[in-house]
Amino acid sequence: MCGAPEQTQELPPGTDLSKQTVVAGTVRTAGEPLGGAYVRLLDDTGEFTAEVVSSASGQFRFFAAPGSWTIRALHRSGIGESTVTANTPGLYTVAVTVS
């Protein structure tokens, strides 16, 4: 079981987006939110960096360093992947479709 905090749409209190890079989004399948997916953050070399489980509403969130990231969602119903370039601090929203 993943020990990550519960995933919600709201950022934790005290999050300063002028200093922190946050990659967040929703995992979907057939247009519907997909909870219980293992969502992985991979760096620009494909190296595994972190993992969370998507919330019941499909949401996930990572605090990351600036850079190019791949977000991969794994679920018994399939796999989905998306990329994001987050070169500066801020909130970057990613949609991942599992099929």
Label each residue range with its predicted role.
Residues 3, 76-99:
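Structured interaction patches on ligand/partner-binding surfaces of diverse proteins
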Residues 21-23, 29-45:
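Short, ordered, surface-exposed loop/turn motifs in non-cytosolic proteins
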